[in-house]
């Protein structure tokens, strides 16, 4: 939100209705699906956000193009309760653990505030097929979310957590977790994916 936009809208509001309205510097939303770029990671649990972004792009007729080498970015409009909502759909190319660089770059460039950002990511704490939406909160051990929290300077944005189930715990928990998120879905699970 810029001082100029507040002043401009304050003046317009006085002339029109005597109400104060503040319009965001950008009325766009940013929807970012997290994952790792490259064919090596296609179809892995950690790329659940990329898969969701691809489904949304197809549904909303969004075409991706490069944004500063940091993300594939597309623009669209969706009808939400009779209202047209403009949005950017992003797939960061920075690898999962540096997702914040791409999200912060897009956010800054298009002046999108954190409360207009939605991040879609895999979540091992949810069973496969479960989806939870939450606003803000902890990263829950997810390195992509930690990176976004750091880069935006706040955890106050929406997350769509997509369940991928949990790796076996035990003596080699870290290795099991890495292998799990970078592994593919089983045959029964693949049948349920779009």
Residue ranges and their predicted role:
Residues 139:
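Conserved TIR/SEFIR loop-to-helix hotspot centered on a Trp-containing motif
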Residues 20-136, 145-161, 166-178:
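Nucleotide and nucleotide-moiety/phosphate-recognizing core
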Residues 173-176, 183-194:
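A charged, well-structured terminal subsegment
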Residues 4-23:
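Short, Lys/Arg-enriched N-terminal segments with co-localized hydrophobic residues
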